[in-house]
Amino acid sequence: MRIAIGCDHIVTDEKMAVSEFLKSKGYEVIDFGTYDHTRTHYPIFGKKVGEAVTSGQADLGVCICGTGVGINNAVNKVPGVRSALVRDMTTALYAKEQLNANVIGFGGKITGELLMCDIIEAFIHAEYKPTEENKKLIAKIEHVESHNAQQTDANFFTEFLEKWDRGEYHD
């Protein structure tokens, strides 16, 4: 199984721990970064993980930022992604079994590394349990997806990053 993983600079260490755990379990990890603590932007990495999952490059995705809120919102903008922000086993299993989630999101400063690893392992092994009700619900979710043609452009964030480098944006 191939698992895409991405994070922002705040949780690089946590992502690396999760990545090493997954590799130790025999999973192929596709790490989209970030790889250090240099200030960066979670939408970039959420988008990369989402695209890897929806293209078939990865089977599942894991996104981590400080609270999980930002990167999870970003990855959910990729058409075909159903990501759940979780911090407990029950929510993760519901997301996979009932909503057929293909990405799982965490707040790396909210949920500890060991718990994230346990939850991810359970998420991987859980199976979607299709029912007429949840199939209809998933279809409704897919119906509200926004298809922004520009987001498939490999340079989608280039202008933003150039402005950032010039100091035109700040937190």
UniProtKB/Swiss-Prot annotation:
One of its GO terms (biological process) is D-allose catabolic process. GO terms for molecular function: galactose-6-phosphate isomerase activity; ribose-5-phosphate isomerase activity. It catalyses: aldehydo-D-galactose 6-phosphate = keto-D-tagatose 6-phosphate. Keywords: Isomerase, Lactose metabolism. The keyword Isomerase applies. The keyword Nucleotide-binding does not apply. Pathway: Carbohydrate metabolism; D-galactose 6-phosphate degradation; D-tagatose 6-phosphate from D-galactose 6-phosphate: step 1/1. It holds the Pfam family LacAB_rpiB. It comes from the Bacteria. Its EC number is 5.3.1.26. Heteromultimeric protein consisting of LacA and LacB. HAMAP family: LacB (MF_01556). PANTHER family: DNA DAMAGE-REPAIR_TOLERATION PROTEIN DRT102, RIBOSE-5-PHOSPHATE ISOMERASE B. Belongs to the LacAB/RpiB family. This is Galactose-6-phosphate isomerase subunit LacB. It comes from Streptococcus pneumoniae serotype 4 (strain ATCC BAA-334 / TIGR4).
